[in-house]
């Protein structure tokens, strides 16, 4: 369970309803793949990821980014049991994909930055703090399969 106040929960749900998973997901995943190029090894089926242009024009990056952000949107509906919500996905990432669990934190950081770029002046320090808490819980839940 993530320890969020009622105000933080309200900020998160209210803001998330304004988020376009397709746009933000592409931006966040693309940023991670470009900023941390070693993470590309988990996405070899995506084809050309050799440059920033290739990454941000890659349909598979956009599709997977949207999928991840849609999953986060669903997790927001389960804030009282994020670990339970992500239990199977955590197991899949650890046992099948062998993803470095720190990459979940990297992706969440890229998502925060992408949200700030998208929301601009609406991305207040209070909102950032709420999402930082939520994303820390999500990264922890996804890394749970490694323990």
Curated annotation (Swiss-Prot):
Coiled-coil residues: none
Tissue: Red blood cells.
UniProt keyword list: Heme, Iron, Metal-binding, Oxygen transport, Transport
Domain of life: Eukaryota
Gene3D superfamilies: Globins
Residues noted as binding heme b in the record, renumbered to the chain: 64, 93
GO cellular component terms, semicolon-separated: hemoglobin complex
Keyword rRNA processing on entry: no
GO function terms (MF aspect): heme binding; metal ion binding; oxygen binding; oxygen carrier activity
Domain Globin positions: 3-147
The protein's role, per its UniProt record: Involved in oxygen transport from the lung to the various peripheral tissues.
Family: Belongs to the globin family.
Assembly, per entry: Heterotetramer of two alpha chains and two beta chains.
Protein's recorded name: Hemoglobin subunit beta-1
Organism this protein belongs to: Xenopus tropicalis (Western clawed frog)
Gene behind this protein: hbb1
């Amino acid at each position: 369970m993530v320890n969020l106040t009622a105000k933080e929960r309200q900020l998160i749900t209210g803001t998330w309803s304004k988020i376009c998973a397709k746009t933000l997901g592409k931006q966040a995943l693309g940023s991670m793949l470009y900023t941390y190029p070693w993470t590309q090894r988990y996405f070899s089926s995506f084809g050309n990821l050799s440059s920033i242009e290739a990454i941000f024009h890659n349909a598979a990056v956009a599709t997977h980014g949207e999928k991840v952000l849609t999953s986060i949107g669903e997790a927001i509906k389960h804030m009282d049991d994020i670990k339970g919500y992500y239990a199977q996905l955590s197991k899949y990432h650890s046992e099948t994909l062998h993803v470095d669990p720190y990459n979940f934190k990297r992706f969440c950081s890229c998502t925060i930055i992408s949200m700030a770029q998208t929301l601009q002046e609406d991305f207040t320090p209070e909102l950032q703090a709420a999402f930082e808490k939520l994303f820390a819980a999500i990264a922890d839940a996804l890394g749970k399969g490694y323990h």
